[in-house]
């Protein structure tokens, strides 16, 4: 249902925007394995490394610096390799 129904409604919200929202929600909860998976998906949806770093920096003030700092190594790992889901 999630990927078949919700993610397919691109006329309501783009895949890129859905990726940003999902990464933000997962980061706020500290769900780092899922963050990494969605960083890979976000990269495929044309999110840049700079945008992800800015999202993490913004969220650091709302969900805590430790959560943001835990995401930065994942961003480097995903954006410095050719990961695919």
Regions found by a protein language model. Give the residues of each.
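Acidic, glycine/proline-rich low-complexity segments that act as flexible tails and inter-domain linkers
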Residues: 1-15, 40, 44, 67-85
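Short, surface-exposed loop/turn motifs that are enriched in glycine and acidic residues
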Residues: 10-11, 25-28
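Helix N-cap / loop-to-helix initiation motif
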Residues: 14, 48-51
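Short, structured motif recognition centered on aromatic/hydrophobic residues
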Residues: 17-26, 55-59
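Generic helix-packing signal
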Residues: 28-29, 46, 60
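Short helix-capping/linker segments at secondary-structure and domain boundaries
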Residues: 29-36, 69
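Mid-chain, well-packed structural core segment of small domains
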Residues: 33-49
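Substrate/cofactor-recognition hotspot
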Residues: 58-60, 65-69
């Amino acid at each position: 249902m999630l990927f078949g129904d919700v993610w397919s409604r691109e006329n309501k919200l783009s895949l890129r925007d859905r990726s940003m929202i999902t990464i933000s929600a997962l980061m706020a909860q500290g769900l780092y394995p899922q963050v990494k998976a969605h960083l890979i998906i976000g990269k495929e949806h044309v999110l840049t490394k700079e945008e992800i770093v800015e999202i993490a920096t913004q969220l650091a003030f709302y969900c805590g610096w430790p959560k943001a700092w835990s995401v930065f190594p994942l961003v480097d790992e995903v954006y410095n390799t050719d990961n695919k889901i």
